[in-house]
């Protein structure tokens, strides 16, 4: 870039501000537009699909530029934030009428994907998180902040594997890492990763900043005083939040210490495969949350999503939630609460915007309505006798003084912004009322003045008017201008008319225009004072919002329990997982036919089920429904089963389906083996493991060998395992592994068509039905027929499977009839020998053939 002195004064001002924010788009306010210059303009024009032009010159070069109207800002910001961009808003703060040189400007806010708070820029049903990381490959400190709610947490995590799984769960839109970290670390590959100066993570500075923020002497009260890495990360987050918001952050009131040991851990693959709140296509339809979320408020939907993605192992918390749901189901109490909860709205985010001092008039109107609904809701909550619900009721206040203040202050349907006034009610402030009266009565004054002047001058064509450039005026046609009285002072000459002003009109103009600007300034001052009053009550209001969000989630789970026919699971000390008539909560909602419920039993005598059966027979559904039932139990919800008895699990693993990881350079089989390795390294005797078609991505022998060894290892680990396979050889595992049992999904053929019955029955499947499924999928008949021929040849040429002696017992499971993948086909030498026509061979030919056969051995 050229020297700053080479630029025009305005562009010098621009570059002084832009140089402080080199990596962010700068929106530079000029009159009624935000202008964007130079490389920012080229980038913004492409991203926003707006016209790129050029204006004038500075430092001898034309200036690339584009612009947007100031009143359209939010729509463009929303698009940029969704694309992961950050924007610096630079406003005019000086008065153009009195400025000498460029109007004074300054940066008033910085919008980044992780620090936005504007309602229009957020997904109301999803947390908007920003995270920071500090540490090395052995131990990491992770801090996470939701600036739109004030939730602020820290934890320390061992190793990249656990860290990446936690980042997958949290899915922060921005991730801050130290600039002195090596390049291309796994964390930096995440979208939104940004490097920050190493001193932003300084642990001593962070500790002081956090203590100052929370007005405490130390961090012991938050249980994280010794988490030095996490404290450094939290300090970086706090600095970044203050830097972007340009204001104090009173809604950040505490720091929560999270522990992985308190939760049921799900890795990224398991989270995706179970489709908790995002389906495999990236949408939200047909996910677990889409079925069980009927929350009345957006803040409750976000809380439910956090519960689903972070199941708990705290039995006291889970049983308290179960008791609460039972209480809400009693006499259908939830039906009375839910309409009242709907009136509360998303006050969690409204309160955060109040804390950030950027709450809009409609935020205050919604808060007013919510506070007005609290007394009736509080009365209904006092009838709830469950201890946890009683605690929530005790936390929830009614705030009659604040409700009255907002009722007196805010009009029923306020405008979107305070900028143009019209937000505060008449009678709220006498001085404002007087100023507004002067401004609003201007129209009547002009009518009266015009009538008086017509009568005084006798000029019937006289008009009194106003425009923004010249102010108030009296207009006469050019032919009558010479008849104007002596006190008329010429103001403007037009084609066919002359405009004048009188001392009386000038005095009114000064008063009226002054009154309008003074009224806007007065209303803005009163509005800011109203925000400060609300900020002084922020702590109890935020506590009430959190309690109401939880009440909404519990009421929702009660409603779902009733309408989806869910039952309360029972936690026991004995290691087990017993489900009667379990169902898949999502699949049963989309089926047009009744869902076939199935039982499951795992305990100290059986820890693994080998599941066989045809494709489309229901193996994957059976496995997934088991995981979802266990997960729902661990958030305190009722579950889709006639009954469920289980012990606490520590992890849920799934190895179900795979696709190439093209970006990471990994094949389908490599992805499958990576997931399998993770399970074999980390599963315990308290883990639930789902393994579907392990080994299918490689050659038959390799795949079967790997599947067999993996199943043996899981049986030795005593993990609760559902192992679905088409390798029927694995059905002999119960002979060598006493904790393993066979089950199958049944099907039958009728008129050469397969019928899936979806019942889970003991023992292995009788056959694969692969050709029948292929026919059902529309594979051409000729191909199916040719496949039958190949199958017949393979089955007749394979050697019979050698069964262990134990398998010959009468009660042993019958191994299905299928070619043994470990049996050899006839040796090529034997095949060739069998085809020889010895009587037609000469002695020389016979000797040559003997050599050929020897070479085949």
UniProtKB/Swiss-Prot annotation:
Domain of life of the organism encoding this protein: Bacteria
PROSITE patterns associated with the record: DNA_MISMATCH_REPAIR_2
Keywords assigned: ATP-binding, DNA damage, DNA repair, DNA-binding, Nucleotide-binding
Annotated ATP binding sites: 613-620
Example of a GO MF term: ATP-dependent DNA damage sensor activity
CDD domains, A to Z: ABC_MutS1
Protein name per the record: DNA mismatch repair protein MutS
Lineage, opening ranks: Bacteria, Pseudomonadati, Pseudomonadota, Gammaproteobacteria, Pseudomonadales
């Amino acid at each position: 870039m050229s020297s700053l002195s080479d630029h025009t004064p305005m562009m010098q001002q621009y570059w002084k501000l832009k140089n402080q924010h080199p990596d962010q788009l700068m929106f530079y306010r000029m009159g009624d537009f935000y202008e964007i210059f130079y490389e920012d303009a080229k980038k913004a024009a492409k991203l926003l699909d707006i016209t790129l032009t050029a204006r004038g010159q500075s430092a001898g070069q034309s200036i690339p530029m584009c612009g947007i109207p100031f009143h359209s800002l939010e729509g463009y910001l929303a698009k940029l934030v969704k694309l992961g961009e950050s924007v610096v808003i630079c406003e005019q703060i000086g008065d153009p009428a009195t400025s000498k040189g460029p109007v004074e400007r300054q940066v008033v806010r910085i919008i980044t994907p992780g620090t936005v708070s504007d309602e229009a820029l957020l997904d109301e049903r999803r947390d908007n998180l920003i995270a920071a990381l500090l540490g090395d490959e052995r131990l990491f400190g992770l801090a996470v902040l939701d600036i739109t709610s004030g939730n602020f947490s820290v934890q320390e995590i061992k190793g990249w594997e656990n860290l990446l799984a936690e980042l997958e769960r949290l899915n922060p839109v921005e991730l801050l890492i130290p600039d002195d970290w090596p390049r291309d670390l796994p964390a930096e590959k995440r979208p939104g990763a940004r490097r920050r100066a190493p001193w932003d993570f300084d642990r001593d500075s962070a500790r002081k900043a956090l203590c100052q923020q929370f007005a405490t002497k130390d961090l012991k009260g938050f249980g994280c005083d010794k988490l030095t890495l996490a404290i450094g990360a939290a300090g970086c987050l706090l600095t970044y939040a203050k830097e972007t918001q340009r204001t104090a952050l009173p809604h950040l009131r505490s720091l929560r210490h999270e522990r992985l040991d308190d939760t049921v851990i799900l890795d990224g693959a398991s989270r995706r495969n179970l489709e908790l709140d995002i389906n495999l296509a990236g949408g939200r339809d047909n996910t677990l949350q889409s079925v069980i979320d009927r929350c009345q408020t957006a803040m409750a939907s976000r809380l439910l999503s956090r519960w689903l993605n972070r199941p708990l192992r705290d039995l006291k918390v889970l049983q308290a939630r179960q008791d609460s749901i039972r209480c809400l189901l009693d006499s259908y109490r939830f039906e009375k609460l839910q309409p009242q909860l709907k009136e509360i709205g998303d006050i969690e985010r409204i309160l955060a915007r109040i804390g950030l001092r950027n709450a809009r008039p409609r935020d205050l109107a919604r808060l007013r309505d919510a506070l007005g609904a609290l007394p009736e809701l509080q009365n209904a909550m006092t009838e709830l006798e469950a201890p946890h619900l009683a605690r929530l009721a005790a936390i929830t206040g009614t705030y009659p003084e604040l409700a009255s203040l907002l009722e007196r202050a805010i009009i029923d349907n306020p405008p979107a912004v305070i900028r143009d006034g019209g937000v505060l009610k008449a009678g709220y402030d006498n001085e404002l009322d007087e100023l507004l009266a002067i401004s609003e009565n201007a129209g009547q004054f002009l009518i009266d003045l015009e009538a008086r002047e017509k009568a005084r001058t006798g000029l019937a064509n006289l008009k009194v008017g106003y425009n923004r450039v010249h102010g108030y005026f009296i207009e006469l046609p050019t032919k009558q201008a010479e008849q104007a009285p002596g006190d008329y002072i010429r103001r403007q000459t037009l084609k066919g008319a002359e405009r004048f002003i009188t001392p009386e009109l000038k005095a009114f103009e000064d008063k009226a225009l002054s009154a309008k600007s003074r009224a806007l300034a007065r209303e803005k001052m009163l509005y800011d004072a109203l925000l400060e009053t609300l900020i002084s009550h922020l702590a109890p209001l935020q506590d009430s919002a959190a309690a109401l969000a939880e009440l909404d989630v519990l009421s929702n789970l009660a409603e779902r329990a009733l309408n989806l026919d869910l039952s309360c699971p029972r936690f026991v000390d004995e290691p087990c997982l017993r489900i009667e008539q379990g169902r898949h909560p999502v699949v049963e909602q989309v089926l047009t036919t009744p869902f076939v419920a199935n039982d499951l039993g795992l305990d100290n005598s059986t820890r693994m089920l080998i599941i066989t059966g045809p494709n489309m027979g229901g193996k994957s559904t059976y496995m997934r429904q088991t995981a979802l039932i266990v997960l729902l139990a661990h958030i305190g919800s009722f579950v889709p089963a006639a009954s469920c008895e289980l012990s606490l699990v520590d992890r849920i693993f799934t190895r179900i389906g795979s696709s190439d990881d093209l970006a990471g350079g990994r094949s389908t089989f490599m992805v499958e083996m990576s997931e399998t390795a993770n399970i074999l390294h980390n599963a315990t005797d308290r883990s639930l493991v789902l393994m579907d078609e392990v080994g299918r991505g490689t050659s038959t022998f390799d795949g079967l060998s790997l599947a067999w060894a993996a199943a043996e290892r899981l049986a030795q680990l005593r993990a609760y395992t559902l192992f679905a396979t088409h390798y029927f050889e694995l059905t002999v595992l119960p002979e060598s592994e006493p904790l393993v049992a066979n089950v199958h999904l049944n099907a039958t053929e009728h008129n050469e068509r397969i019928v899936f019955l979806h019942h889970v029955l003991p023992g292995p499947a009788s056959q694969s039905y692969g050709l029948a499924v292929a026919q059902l999928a529309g594979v051409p008949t000729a191909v199916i027929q040719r496949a039958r021929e190949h199958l017949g040849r393979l089955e007749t040429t394979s050697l019979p499977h050698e069964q262990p002696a134990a398998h010959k017992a009468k009660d042993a499971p019958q191994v299905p009839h299928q070619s043994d993948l470990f049996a050899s086909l006839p040796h090529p030498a034997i095949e060739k020998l069998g085809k020889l026509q010895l009587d037609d061979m000469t002695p020389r030919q016979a000797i040559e053939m003997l050599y050929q056969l020897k070479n085949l051995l």
